């Protein structure tokens, strides 16, 4: 099936007399006829449902849909994008390990990797996404367990060279994890380019309406965990009757382990209602992404021609540094987020933003409504000046999330903002 059809039909097929729309199963628990049956489910939680702390029929339908959209073997939803990022790392890293990440990633992820992971005894080694192969290779250590990057970085809009980083990661016997939030599987499917694990903040384009907070992890099912670097996958799990994930769940051992261990212990699972809302957003994802891309390229060209704008970052522009990579990985478009640097720095940026009427000042992105943010004052506020530079952010940078309003109205709003500075 094509992705437009998958968004509507994957994950849930109603039987005779059942609801057409994925139903909300608002229940914490599930009933069995005998204690023996419950015991059997606890021996192998993949056979049936136990408790809504880590599985639910509504969420299960969404997980199956997203796995299909990304071309993966299985998926696990989480209560936020940050929870997905955290679980994706902790599933295969422990104290004493290290991992490699692109410098051009979301500010909250940088805080997670630089501060919280360090407190857990896990080292994050950053590399410039434009580094040479030799420079990237030099970052690897004997204890390195994975490589991490974002398809389209938030907010610098760097396009991550997935295939190149995948090849280097695999050469070193470790998986590549890609955050595909901004691209969505409509614009890019990282697994097709060599990524092993794909994550999302589903609060963004997948939802599209700013009504639920969530995340998801997708297991490609393709990575070979038996190379000796991942005893957590290949040796008995003492918390689950000595289960060896690569042997018992060879179709998707990574995601099964994440659910049976991390979700069981952390409980960062979304509510059934959140999953229901997410599914509604997914059903219109292709239609929305087409319009986001169409509106954004028009707005980006307008900004590029404005003499009060110092620079524009939007990979869809032919002048953009990452346009060639965008043509390779994102041939249908580069989503709806634009970053631009306004002349005059931070104070001028604030005056411009405060003068807008249509675009909302808010800590969100990828909504159907146009919104705007000053990253250095908000999402990346906790970073040092050095970290801001490494992430491609300066005081005059504004992140514009182009919505689905008529593009002429969006541009008119920007024009009156420029007139105020």
Per-segment meaning from a language model:
Residues 1-56, 64:
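N-terminal "arm"/small-domain region of PLP-dependent enzymes with the aminotransferase-like
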Residues 4-13, 75-305:
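Conserved PLP-enzyme active-site core in the AAT-like
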Residues 47, 73, 213, 274-278, ...:
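Short amphipathic alpha-helical segments
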Residues 289, 297, 303-304, 308-398, ...:
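Conserved C-terminal alpha-helix-loop-beta "cap" of PLP-dependent enzymes
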Residues 15, 31-35, 224-225, 285, ...:
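Short, acidic Gly/Pro/Ser/Thr-rich loop/turn segments
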Residues 34-86, 108-117:
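Conserved N-terminal alpha-helix of the aminotransferase class I/II PLP-enzyme fold
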Residues 15-16, 206, 267, 328-330, ...:
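Short Gly/Pro-enriched turn/cap motifs at secondary-structure boundaries
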Residues 1, 114, 123-124, 138, ...:
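PLP-dependent enzyme catalytic core of the Aspartate aminotransferase-like
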